């Protein structure tokens, strides 16, 4: 029996690595969604950061599923600082300002996954994690940015929890895969139920 084909509507290397390491056979494609325009529209309608992650994941999955067979996974993650959506930094100066803004605070990461088939969503999940950033020194921050460089611009919080970025935190509550941007366990259950993984 052949497995249901799976497409990941994402170019995120972190999400691709998570699925690959979990043993999921998939093909990754760019979703071709203008995320900035979509976010701006959703923010204008006072949509919460949690629901923005869900809406963007759905847009990606649905768009790609109109062109690809089988199951299409769309995913998105937002950073929620006291109800305010925080976007990825565009430069190292912005990354420094972002990390200073997060210093000594607690924020949430909302990670959404939507699976679509034939242009319509058929499954979704949004999971959240709470992360408390320690009151690190300016000197530590400068060294961290110097060592990590442009890699910080790929993460919404300007940290890579799977590497040295874990040192930014004094408390983390939530699932590791949710923090990395792909709530995995529920997704794997769904893929098994729909013939994309062997049981």
Curated annotation (Swiss-Prot):
| Any coiled-coil regions, as ranges | none
Which keywords are on file for this protein? Cytoplasm, Hydrolase, Nucleotide metabolism
Q: A Gene Ontology biological process annotation? A: nucleotide metabolic process
Cofactor(s), by name: a divalent metal cation
Q: Does the keyword Cytoplasm apply?
A: yes
Location(s), subcellular: Cytoplasm
Q: Name the catalysed reactions.
A: a ribonucleoside 5'-triphosphate + H2O = a ribonucleoside 5'-phosphate + diphosphate + H(+); a 2'-deoxyribonucleoside 5'-triphosphate + H2O = a 2'-deoxyribonucleoside 5'-phosphate + diphosphate + H(+)
Q: Name one GO cellular component term.
A: cytoplasm
Under which EC number(s) is this enzyme classified? 3.6.1.9
**Which cysteines share a disulfide bond?**
none
Give the domain of life.
Bacteria
Please list the residues that make up the active site: 76
Q: Which GO terms describe its molecular function?
A: nucleoside triphosphate diphosphatase activity
Q: What InterPro entries does the annotation carry?
A: ITPase-like_fam (IPR029001), Maf-like (IPR003697)
Q: Which PANTHER family match?
A: BIFUNCTIONAL DTTP/UTP PYROPHOSPHATASE/METHYLTRANSFERASE PROTEIN-RELATED, BIFUNCTIONAL DTTP_UTP PYROPHOSPHATASE_METHYLTRANSFERASE PROTEIN-RELATED
Q: Which family does it belong to?
A: Belongs to the Maf family.
Give the function comment from the record.
Answer: Nucleoside triphosphate pyrophosphatase. May have a dual role in cell division arrest and in preventing the incorporation of modified nucleotides into cellular nucleic acids.
In terms of HAMAP family, this protein maps to: Maf (MF_00528)
Name it.
Answer: Nucleoside triphosphate pyrophosphatase
* Source lineage: Bacteria, Pseudomonadati, Pseudomonadota, Alphaproteobacteria, Caulobacterales
